[in-house]
Amino acid sequence: MSINYIATSKLPTPWGVFSMHGFEDTQTGKEHVALTFGEWQPSHAILGRIHSECLTGDALFSLRCDCGFQLQTAMQNIAEAGQGFILYLRQEGRGIGLLNKIRAYELQDAGANTVEANERLGFDADMRKYDMIAPMLEKIAVTQVKLMTNNPRKVKAMQDLGIVVAERVPLQVGKNRYNEAYLKTKSTELGHMMSEHHFNDDKGN
């Protein structure tokens, strides 16, 4: 895999001005983004998140998942901390693409859960890969991470690439009546680390 750095610009947001660093995977043509806020020493553990693209949740305000809520909360947490990063990876639908994601949603509307829907379409439950994060983190001078995630696969992916995960920071937000079953499936079948308190908290309903 060859990841080329392209350019950096400012990105004003409701939580402050981030820097947006663009990267291109020369093998797939996919474009990935690193958002950074503040400055740091490479030897310090930096608050960050690996976030896979979710058009429906991030841009269209879908309540079927927790992705948009997690992205906004991660950006707010980083701004409040004064420093941090988000790697925004173009891996829509856990790696199956937007149109296949819509096909999977159609199956879910008929009763399948998120894992069953992927498998009925001939995909694994999670098709994402994380090889691209190593050169992206190298460019933004991150070697140790306080990782905002509920997903153990992301923790392992970083560790396998030699990146120190100094701390896992839970990101349990966005539960509502439309996504509660989806979140439970992620917990029971994909191993996402979510507390019972998250499922018992009715504030998002």
Swiss-Prot record:
GO terms assigned for molecular function: GTP binding; GTP cyclohydrolase II activity; zinc ion binding
GO cellular component term of the entry, any: cytosol
Domain of life according to the entry: Bacteria
Record carries keyword tRNA processing: no
Cofactor note: Binds 1 zinc ion per subunit.
Name recorded for this polypeptide: GTP cyclohydrolase-2
Binding site for GTP: 49-53, 70, 92-94, 114, 149, 154
Pathway: Cofactor biosynthesis; riboflavin biosynthesis; 5-amino-6-(D-ribitylamino)uracil from GTP: step 1/4
Recorded catalytic activity of this chain's protein: GTP + 4 H2O = 2,5-diamino-6-hydroxy-4-(5-phosphoribosylamino)-pyrimidine + formate + 2 phosphate + 3 H(+)
Family in the record: Belongs to the GTP cyclohydrolase II family.
Cofactor(s) essential for the protein: Zn(2+)
Keyword Metal-binding: yes
Keyword field: GTP-binding, Hydrolase, Metal-binding, Nucleotide-binding, Riboflavin biosynthesis, Zinc
Pfam families: GTP_cyclohydro2 (PF00925)
Active site: 126 (proton acceptor), 128 (nucleophile)
The EC number(s) this enzyme carries: 3.5.4.25
Cited function: Catalyzes the conversion of GTP to 2,5-diamino-6-ribosylamino-4(3H)-pyrimidinone 5'-phosphate (DARP), formate and pyrophosphate.
GO biological process, one term: riboflavin biosynthetic process
InterPro entries: GTP_cyclohydro_II (IPR032677), RibA (IPR000926), RibA-like_sf (IPR036144)
Ligand binding (Zn(2+)): 54, 65, 67
